[in-house]
From Swiss-Prot:
Expressed by the venom gland. Belongs to the neurotoxin 14 (magi-1) family. 08 (Ltx-4) subfamily. This is U1-theraphotoxin-Tal1a. One of its GO terms (cellular component) is extracellular region. The presence of a 'disulfide through disulfide knot' structurally defines this protein as a knottin. Residues 1-22 form the signal peptide. Disulfide bonds join 58-73, 65-78, 72-93. Residues 23-57 form a propeptide. Keywords: Amidation, Cleavage on pair of basic residues, Disulfide bond, Ion channel impairing toxin, Knottin, Neurotoxin, Secreted, Signal, Toxin. The modification Serine amide is found at residue 98. Coiled coil: none annotated. It comes from the Eukaryota. One of its GO terms (molecular function) is sodium channel inhibitor activity.
Length: 99
C-alpha cells in the first residue's frame, strides 16, 4: 500500500510541476507579446526607419573615388583634384560646396 501512495504522489508531483511550468511559459509569452505591442505603439515606424536608414560604408574626405561609381559619403562629392593634387590623375571625395 505504501508503494502505491508513493507512486501516486510522484505522478501528482510531476503533473503539478509540468502544468505549473506551462502556466509560467504562457504568462511569459503573453508578457513578451504585450511588451512588443507597447513598443510598437510607442515608437511606431520610427524604429524600423532608423534601423535601415544608416548610411552604408562610404568614403570620407580626401579619399580617392571612382568618378563613374562614386561611393563618397552623402556630405561629400567625387571631384577632380585642383591645385596640388592634379598630378594624381584620380578623383577624390571633397565636401560639397554650398551654393
Amino acid at each position: 500500500m505504501n508503494t502505491i501512495q508513493v507512486i501516486i504522489f510522484a505522478v501528482v508531483l510531476v503533473l503539478t510541476v509540468t502544468v505549473g511550468q506551462a502556466d509560467e511559459d504562457s504568462a511569459e509569452t503573453s508578457l513578451l507579446r504585450k511588451l512588443k505591442e507597447a513598443e510598437a505603439s510607442l515608437f511606431g515606424q520610427h524604429l524600423e526607419e532608423s534601423q535601415h536608414s544608416r548610411e552604408k560604408r562610404c568614403l570620407g574626405e580626401n579619399v580617392p573615388c571612382d568618378k563613374d561609381r562614386p561611393n563618397c559619403c552623402s556630405r561629400y562629392e567625387c571631384l577632380e583634384p585642383t591645385g596640388y593634387g592634379w598630378w594624381y590623375a584620380s578623383y577624390y571625395c571633397y565636401k560639397k560646396r554650398s551654393g
